[in-house]
Amino acid sequence: MTTTTEFPSATAKARFVRVSPTKARRVIDLVRGKSVNDAIDILRWAPQAASEPVAKVIASAAANAQNNDGLDPSTLVVSEIFADEGPTAKRIRPRAQGRAFRIRKRTSHITVVVESRPKQEKGGKAGASKASSRAARAQGSKAAAAKKTESKGGTS
């Protein structure tokens, strides 16, 4: 049996956004699980057109968390984000010899859930043990190199 910890969260939705859900998902996958500040920074420099509406929804969810629930904006993390398909507007493009091709103007419903998670301290015991093990390996390799040169010097 697994236990899940419930964190306080806030939601925002943008409906009928004039961007294809497939193209929105390309951008959404970049920011899932990131902090809100990191996600907005990533989207600010993303070249895709879908990054603008996704960034707006994330900013809206962060504002909802701060204003409605009183959560600290520095602890917010994008816990859930997804794009569903909205209605498709159909248009006709006239083609040669009386033909007509259909143009599908797709829309998306973008949903974002942000959670307030406590910040995890970096560089705790794990970082110290990693540095000490690296130092021990370096010391061992230096000793081995000195021993090797010593043995070469003694034989000649």
UniProtKB/Swiss-Prot annotation:
<dbReference type="GO" id="GO:0006412">
    <property type="term" value="P:translation"/>
</dbReference>
<keyword id="KW-0694">RNA-binding</keyword>
<dbReference type="InterPro" id="IPR001063">
    <property type="entry name" value="Ribosomal_uL22"/>
</dbReference>
<dbReference type="InterPro" id="IPR005727">
    <property type="entry name" value="Ribosomal_uL22_bac/chlpt-type"/>
</dbReference>
<protein>
    <recommendedName>
        <fullName>Large ribosomal subunit protein uL22</fullName>
    </recommendedName>
</protein>
<keyword id="KW-0689">Ribosomal protein</keyword>
<feature type="region of interest" description="Disordered">
    <location>
        <begin position="114"/>
        <end position="156"/>
    </location>
</feature>
<feature type="compositionally biased region" description="Low complexity">
    <location>
        <begin position="127"/>
        <end position="146"/>
    </location>
</feature>
<dbReference type="GO" id="GO:0003735">
    <property type="term" value="F:structural constituent of ribosome"/>
</dbReference>
<dbReference type="GO" id="GO:0022625">
    <property type="term" value="C:cytosolic large ribosomal subunit"/>
</dbReference>
<dbReference type="InterPro" id="IPR018260">
    <property type="entry name" value="Ribosomal_uL22_CS"/>
</dbReference>
<keyword id="KW-0699">rRNA-binding</keyword>
<dbReference type="Pfam" id="PF00237">
    <property type="entry name" value="Ribosomal_L22"/>
</dbReference>
<dbReference type="InterPro" id="IPR036394">
    <property type="entry name" value="Ribosomal_uL22_sf"/>
</dbReference>
<dbReference type="GO" id="GO:0019843">
    <property type="term" value="F:rRNA binding"/>
</dbReference>
<comment type="function">
    <text>The globular domain of the protein is located near the polypeptide exit tunnel on the outside of the subunit, while an extended beta-hairpin is found that lines the wall of the exit tunnel in the center of the 70S ribosome.</text>
</comment>
<comment type="function">
    <text>This protein binds specifically to 23S rRNA; its binding is stimulated by other ribosomal proteins, e.g. L4, L17, and L20. It is important during the early stages of 50S assembly. It makes multiple contacts with different domains of the 23S rRNA in the assembled 50S subunit and ribosome.</text>
</comment>
<comment type="subunit">
    <text>Part of the 50S ribosomal subunit.</text>
</comment>
<comment type="similarity">
    <text>Belongs to the universal ribosomal protein uL22 family.</text>
</comment>
<dbReference type="InterPro" id="IPR047867">
    <property type="entry name" value="Ribosomal_uL22_bac/org-type"/>
</dbReference>
<feature type="compositionally biased region" description="Basic and acidic residues">
    <location>
        <begin position="147"/>
        <end position="156"/>
    </location>
</feature>
<keyword id="KW-0687">Ribonucleoprotein</keyword>
